[in-house]
Amino acid sequence: MITVALAKGALLKDSVTRFAKAGLDFSAVLDPSNRQLMVPSECGRAKALLVRNGDVPVYVAYGQAQLGVVGFDVLSEHQMPVANLVDLSFGECHMAVAVKETSHYRSAADLPAHCRVASKFTNCARRFFEDIDLPVELVHLTGSVELGPLTGMAEAIVDLVATGRTLRENGLIEIDHLFDSTARLIGHPLSLRLDSGDLRSVVEAMNTNDKSIPFK
């Protein structure tokens, strides 16, 4: 039986739609009355694990799920040993550096050395600032990072941006771009190598009109 890790939240509906097109119907997870965290597919040959976004690559890396759907932002932050199989082309957003619009900073390079930067994605932020050779103090937050600059705790934030509305409504502007992010189909490397064909058929079906990274 194929086990698929699905992230609760914004990516769930589109993930279920894509798996349905590949022959795996997990629509039961969209039922508001559902309280199960392990849900079988209608065909009975697969089951879905409903987990938090950041836990998807963990379940896949440890082989408790053979496939999963997660944002590229999460893959970049945690860098778990999983196979990045298909760019599913939904859940589009990007990682950016933002500051108060009243500040004089117009690029990350303008920020003062050793300033505080708030983020949920401290690993992504660390690599970015190391790449531009700017030492900063990273402050890890789990929500509402926009409050960092507004309260004076941080000069800047590194966060995901979709429409930019939250930034605008809180008087913040983007000053640098780290990378674009979309939902990705990921796989457990050993399971893919030992696959008798079931996993490959699902991956190929989900790869229709999308970008894939062939696996061996």
Curated annotation (Swiss-Prot):
Main location: cytoplasm
EC annotation from Swiss-Prot or TrEMBL: 2.4.2.17
Keywords assigned by UniProt, alphabetized: Amino-acid biosynthesis, ATP-binding, Cytoplasm, Glycosyltransferase, Histidine biosynthesis, Nucleotide-binding, Transferase
Pathway membership: Amino-acid biosynthesis; L-histidine biosynthesis; L-histidine from 5-phospho-alpha-D-ribose 1-diphosphate: step 1/9
Gene3D superfamilies cross-referenced by the UniProt entry: Periplasmic binding protein-like II
Localization annotation: Cytoplasm
GO biological process, any: L-histidine biosynthetic process
InterPro entries on file: ATP_PRibTrfase_cat (IPR013820), ATP_PRibTrfase_CS (IPR018198), ATP_PRibTrfase_HisG (IPR001348), ATP_PRibTrfase_HisG_short (IPR024893)
Catalytic activity as recorded in UniProt: 1-(5-phospho-beta-D-ribosyl)-ATP + diphosphate = 5-phospho-alpha-D-ribose 1-diphosphate + ATP
Pfam families per record: HisG (PF01634)
Keyword flag ATP-binding: yes
CC annotations in GO: cytoplasm
Complex formation: Heteromultimer composed of HisG and HisZ subunits.
Physiological role: Catalyzes the condensation of ATP and 5-phosphoribose 1-diphosphate to form N'-(5'-phosphoribosyl)-ATP (PR-ATP). Has a crucial role in the pathway because the rate of histidine biosynthesis seems to be controlled primarily by regulation of HisG enzymatic activity.
Record text about domains: Lacks the C-terminal regulatory region which is replaced by HisZ.
UniProt-recorded name of the protein: ATP phosphoribosyltransferase
Organism: Prochlorococcus marinus (strain MIT 9211)
Gene (UniProt): hisG
